[in-house]
From Swiss-Prot:
Binding-site residues, NADP(+): 272-277
Provenance organism: Hordeum vulgare (Barley)
Pathway the protein takes part in: Porphyrin-containing compound metabolism; protoporphyrin-IX biosynthesis; 5-aminolevulinate from L-glutamyl-tRNA(Glu): step 1/2
Miscellaneous remark of the record: During catalysis, the active site Cys acts as a nucleophile attacking the alpha-carbonyl group of tRNA-bound glutamate with the formation of a thioester intermediate between enzyme and glutamate, and the concomitant release of tRNA(Glu). The thioester intermediate is finally reduced by direct hydride transfer from NADPH, to form the product GSA.
PANTHER family given in the database record: GLUTAMYL-TRNA REDUCTASE (PTHR43120:SF7), GLUTAMYL-TRNA REDUCTASE 1, CHLOROPLASTIC (PTHR43120)
Protein name: Glutamyl-tRNA reductase 3, chloroplastic
Amino acid sequence: MASTSTASATAMAGAFAAAGVNKPRGSAACPRVPAGGRQRLSCVVRCDAGPGVPAQMAAMAASVAALEQFKISADRYMKEKSSIAVIGLSIHTAPVEMREKLAVAEELWPRAVAELTNLNHIEKAAVLSPCNRMEIYVVALSWNRGIREIVDWMSMKSGIPAVELREHLFMFRDSDATRHLFEVSSGLDSLVLGEGQILAQVKQVVRSGQNSGGLGKNIDRMFKDAITAGKRVRSETNISCGAVSVSSAAVELALMKLPKSECLSARMLLIGAGKMGRLVAKHLAAKGCKKVVIVNRSVERVDAIREEMQGIEIVYRSLTEMYEAAADADVVFTSTSSESPLFTKEHAEALPPVSGALGGVRLFVDISVPRNVSACVSDVGHARVYNVDDLKEVVEANKEDRLRKAMEAQTIISEELKRFEAWRDSMETVPTIKKLRSYADRVRASELDKCLQKIGEDALTKKMRRSIEQLSTGIVNRLLHGPLQHLRCDGTDNRTLDETLENMHALNRMFGLDTEKAVMEQKIKTKVEKQKTQN
């Protein structure tokens, strides 16, 4: 974490102007904003050899040129510290028509992470893409360039022009990005305040990232701390008590649209038996529904639901029987991962009308993203479609009490945020500590070797040699103890981060460690080698 520069506010304005996205909440400038306006520099080095130069000489020249390029790149990026950033959209900023084009299925998260980390200025990445949001968390080598690359990637993936996309994106950086994730994990940013399913989805990001290796230590730690924050908020504030979920809100909405006298007699069809579908069945049972027909690819998940819910009749239908089952249903819930609509206007027109006691209208309640039911189905006279964006009217009724609990939750989030920032700050000085110890150990080993040569190997017993080595190590450790104490940044003393960083820079100058440049050179070198391997 770098100290705030005088150019921070200007650089932040430049970053938003360049990326064309909304400013982070909270402050006009964030603490790690780099000075903008540097020339764009490609990390890919080309070195053309003349026709008479052997291939090995050309390769050697390319290698030397690449090393020089690393140094130039490192110099230019020195003031652009690696930043944690999140860029995305949610139900609060974008309609479902846009969110579904950007949605990334869970099994495709690793591929998306691989594509993102292949971008020139993205070091590590994570994707969180449940039904109500699509968020990309990254460690960016360059703030301005990295954000532009992500927006372009999102535009390419979705087919939405970048200009249109920017109108709906939000972006947070460093501590603002961390706070946002902690709020998401705690259910404070959900459509349904305090809902619990988002915490499971945050956990899945960690599991997916551990398998793909794309998270890196900063994002991995941030997500794990977000899980801790989410658990604490739910256990210490009871924000989830009485809270509805997306699935229960879908059931409530369907029952609101049915005549009260016919709610329990309406024929219910559920398409999809995943996590969301299972919760729909559970809430239907809790409302007194006696029978639910479930269409699913395999019978095993339906059997599991049947075993869990003994008080309701569960009938299984295969996917080939879906339209036949829909013809016999008054209310159709859809919750699948299908990339294309299951019901179009033509499908709805082919279905027979429902009972006049139910108003003659078949209800489609679609909680899938991408949507399983085309919006044009509502153009059919005897059909109405509701999607996740229509759940807001149900949610508002239960919101006031949980808003009070959300204020309590912010105290917990601030505590966890402080703990994470202290850890991240402590990581800032680790390279300097390592290089200083390595430098001191090289000096110790060199001087020890000179001493032993003067004494003569034959004049020393093993015990005497070991004692001399321990003496040299002890002297070095005692000498380093004071300086290293002044590099501690874990919140256990009264030293500010700026003071700690000043100490770090002083040690770098005094001992010629050049740590920051070496770290950046290594990052750029890793990027170039990765690109060469893929090409």
